[in-house]
From Swiss-Prot:
It is an enzyme of class 1 (oxidoreductase). Signal peptide: none annotated. SUPFAM superfamilies: Formate/glycerate dehydrogenase catalytic domain-like, NAD(P)-binding Rossmann-fold domains. This is Putative 2-hydroxyacid dehydrogenase SA2098.
Amino acid sequence: MEKVYVAGAIPEVGLKLLQEHFEVEMYEGKGLVDKDTLIKGVKNATALISLLSTNVDKDVIDAGKDLKIIANYGAGFNNIDIEYAREKSIDVTNTPKASTNATADLTIGLVLAVARRIVEGDQLSRTTGFDGWAPLFFRGREVSGKTIGIIGLGEIGSAVARRARAFDMDVLYTGPNRKEEKEREIGAKYVDLDTLLKNADFITINAAYNPKMHHLIDTEQFKMMKSTVYLINASRGPIVHEQALVQALKDNEIEGAALDVYEFEPDITDDLKSLNNVVLTPHIGNATFEARDMMSKIVANAAISAVQGEKPQFVVN
């Protein structure tokens, strides 16, 4: 029986599938798998199930001389050297569609949380309390009727747009390609990045990360935004220059931010933790029972397909 190495615990539905077709070795230690353990694990393995937090670099790929597939448990894949994997004729797959609804739900949840100061209000209610209802007390911003600017109208961005339309929001989007069919379906308008930054009341980042996207949102971009804008990032941390974001918040150049991802993840900049107009969540975009179960089935089936000589779904290289 061929071996699969699983770089961390995954839901049982996927693990059982793997156990039916492979000798399964899984990292069960505390925290993230370290490089030496990963290199040891991929030796003699035909398939690797990697997590978003698993750094699969050239050294790891070279150690996995028998690898046919690296099935990444997540929609993103910037944790893997996909070009080098291609050179080695190793398929790399991801789990794109499984994350769509969960991540879109969280994105809109972050919009509401930061605009209506929900987390801040929860903390107040649990600590000092409040003196009762008052006309000027704890005001936030309404979402309905505002303009949302979506960076990246892929599967997740489109799902965010549909939810935003249910709030009677006007939808702007930007990306490398115009998507006229989706524009008609959703009621979205394509604009360039600068126009989106200048006109949106809420900016959500839902684009996939690649090196060209690094620090797409930096000091110059913050200066283009409305002073009342909220920035929401549920994609990848390095798309936003985190120190520039901190400065924009401190200088009141923008009204608030809600982040599920971080530039130096899992580390979170201390300044972000100290600001009341920032909502922080621990990279839980697709952290639902439904999504995570589906993701585990997708990676398991991809690995099974690869060892059976079939082309797996969702190859990214």
